[in-house]
Structures are given as C-alpha cells and as structure tokens.
C-alpha cells in the first residue's frame, strides 16, 4: 500500500514520540502515533517495568489515551522503533482490532516504511 505524505508525517510523529519511551530494561524504545478520523493525533510510548509483565506497549498506550479522552474513531497508527522491522505485537493487534478492524497500520519492515490494514496483520481476530 503506497504511503501518503500524511502517513509519513504520522510515522515521523511516532519516531519523535519514541524519544520519550521508558525502556531501561530492553533498551528498545517504541513510539506510536494514532491518527483519528477528525485529524487529531494521539501518541504513546512503551513503558517498561521491572516486573516485565506490567510493561505496556506504545500502541496500546496511544489507543488507551484516545479512548480515555472519548475518541474511538481511528484512521491510522504508525509505529517506530530503532529496528529493521517493528510491527505491532499480537496483544496490540487484538486491542486495536476491538476499535478499528481495518485500521491502517504503518511500520518499518526490513528498513522500509510500509503499511497494511490491521485485518491483514490479524486475519483471525478474537471476538465475543
């Protein structure tokens, strides 16, 4: 899927957000930028904890911040980490699909910024 200028701007916001990540254990800072349909952008970063299971990913933190402010109409999310490939983890995919199964996901794969619909990354989502 071709990336628009708006998609690349969103990716750059995710890159900038990653500087605020709290990743003292993995040293793997991640930033996410979630664009809402109204054009607003909500960012999130990963926040690690010494009790590793309490760590929260950047994508989920962005989604939770948006939901907490009453915003649930998501258009796209960009994820940045200083790695050749950094797609969202399975837990983040499941959380995002709760709100936007066709969410446009932008991330770096093999050093190139790419995008795909969330339904392609999580074809068999869990639903009740």
Can you describe what each PLM-predicted range is?
Residues 1-12, 72:
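Short, compositionally biased leader-like segments
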Residues 27-36:
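Short beta-strand scaffold segments in enzyme catalytic cores
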Residues 14, 32-33, 62, 66:
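Small-residue (primarily alanine) positions within well-ordered alpha-helices
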Residues 20-26, 93-98:
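Short linear motifs in intrinsically disordered
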Residues 8-23:
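Short, basic/aromatic recognition patches
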Residues 3-4, 23, 51-52:
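Short, surface-exposed loop/turn motifs that are enriched in glycine and acidic residues
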Residues 43-128:
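Zn2+-dependent cytidine deaminase-like catalytic core
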